[in-house]
Amino acid sequence: MIFDKGNVEDFDKELWDAIHAEEERQEHHIELIASENMVSKAVMAAQGSVLTNKYAEGYPGNRYYGGTECVDIVETLAIERAKKLFGAAFANVQAHSGSQANAAAYMALIEAGDTVLGMDLAAGGHLTHGSPVNFSGKTYHFVGYSVDADTEMLNYEAILEQAKAVQPKLIVAGASAYSRNIDFEKFRAIADHVGAYLMVDMAHIAGLVAAGVHPSPVPYAHIVTSTTHKTLRGPRGGLILTNDEALAKKINSAVFPGLQGGPLEHVIAAKAVAFKEALDPAFKDYAQAIIDNTAAMAAVFAQDDRFRLISGGTDNHVFLVDVTKVIANGKLAQNLLDEVNITLNKNAIPFETLSPFNTSGIRIGCAAITSRGMGVKESQTIARLIIKALVNHDQETILEEVRQEVRQLTDAFPLYKK
């Protein structure tokens, strides 16, 4: 019987080897990809539970299948915890991803072809904020706003003037590579001025918002979307919040049956665990440590004139660095750092001159190293190791030194092998 095959290692050695190799990679590499984090064993246990067997189209108390009394409890726990965590009146926890959450929000707020003002991808926005290769840019008429050419920060007066000119039905705030706090109150004022809805995509900063160390968009946005991983440190999935009951009904209809069929109740259970973890007072200390570590790491780059820190600093979990004075492009930097077991990603910088396949910059985030227990001292050390590797990118002896120092750090802060 299939139920006898409960051990992946014995049943599927080929797959197990790949999983084990990934576990070893995470254990012994320094993870600086800003959209990644390390979940608890409790989150993983919930996601790997028997809930994966249950189909449950619909919502708690209103399902299209029988036998849903247990998953109703699970999903209701996730909903109520999300509402409490973010101070929202309504929450939908069924979206499979942040992109699905954004798609549902658009469906709830606007029609195909409507004009939307969103952050340009090159300035730090996201694919789902109007990229022409994404469903958002193909379905709606997106106009991109950028950052100020001198400060590399959002210029709210300029965004207001742009909104007046294009008269959008919706304004999208939020980013995937913007290192500064976003003034959601100003965005709402801009939206109100032109009669537009405001949607905030807080996927990257959700954990910081939950902990109260970053301004919350919930009091200002008509709809807030998010992922449940990244700084929130939950499973990979989506979340939608609103304080408007009429919009909540539209959101629910957009998610199901509009975009999705049955929800992933095992993932929703893992979301519930993550929300409970984030409601613990210790999570605020964790979120503040992310900000402290990121600022400390960024400061090392700011003090080295061979690198340029985009916008001059960071207020959150992420920052961008122009590396072109020491190496040809961000892609080469990413690949080189992979070789010394430091994982991050190439990233376009504002007013980028290179191809998006190469880029001038790299993006660095500190959520994952903070989850391992690393602090300011280790963050500064990691920054120096990155600089050491990039500056000496053709010196194998020095690169080997960096590898050894990385291994010492990861051994000192084990992930799951405690």
Curated annotation (Swiss-Prot):
One cellular-component annotation, GO: cytosol
EC numbers for this chain: 2.1.2.1
Cofactors (names): pyridoxal 5'-phosphate
Modified residues (N6-(pyridoxal phosphate)lysine): K230
UniProt keyword annotation of Heme present: no
Subunit structure: Homodimer.
Protein name: Serine hydroxymethyltransferase
Organism for this UniProt entry: Streptococcus pyogenes serotype M3 (strain ATCC BAA-595 / MGAS315)
Taxonomic classification: Bacteria, Bacillati, Bacillota, Bacilli, Lactobacillales
